[in-house]
């Protein structure tokens, strides 16, 4: 398993900054301000990984209000998109004010099935560029193995932090059983903080030095949400 280093991320600094400026322009068209889930640099991280992979089909697991669906469509405008969330079965029972504004795409296929129960292999249909994105707060080793069984090699995980959280992350697994990940993963890239992060919530404390990006006028909205850092991680399976 090849883990991308801070030095390697710094080596891509010019490309990252250029991509971030383009992303800031795209964000002016966002359907709503995301108050939960992907925000700031973490939203850019998903956009960056999806755009770089250029998948023909994307599986989004954990949709909620749909902000990440919109991000995926901006990064891969020609991709087929399949969205999975039990919310779709329950949404009519939840007052709209509890959810807020939502984005539902006419391009996407929506399902209340769990990813593990859906016919993913048939939907992948041998496409080597298929990508899955998980923001579902479920343990990640089962998700990784489900992707492998379905023929998906490109996987992006949100909330891949080493601190105690709502689920077992890949960082937890790296600390506990690194050989398991070594057997399954070819490349492992956790998107860096672009600016300093110092975030506390209950017993959780996230602190990152960042890599010193400038705070340009067009980047201020993204910089404002810099503390919503969720360690978005791209994995390429063997």
Model regions and ranges:
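Class I SAM-dependent methyltransferase Rossmann-like catalytic core
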Residues: 12-53, 70
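S-adenosylmethionine/decaboxylated-SAM
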Residues: 43, 47-238
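N-terminal auxiliary segments of SAM/dcSAM-dependent transferases
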Residues: 1-11
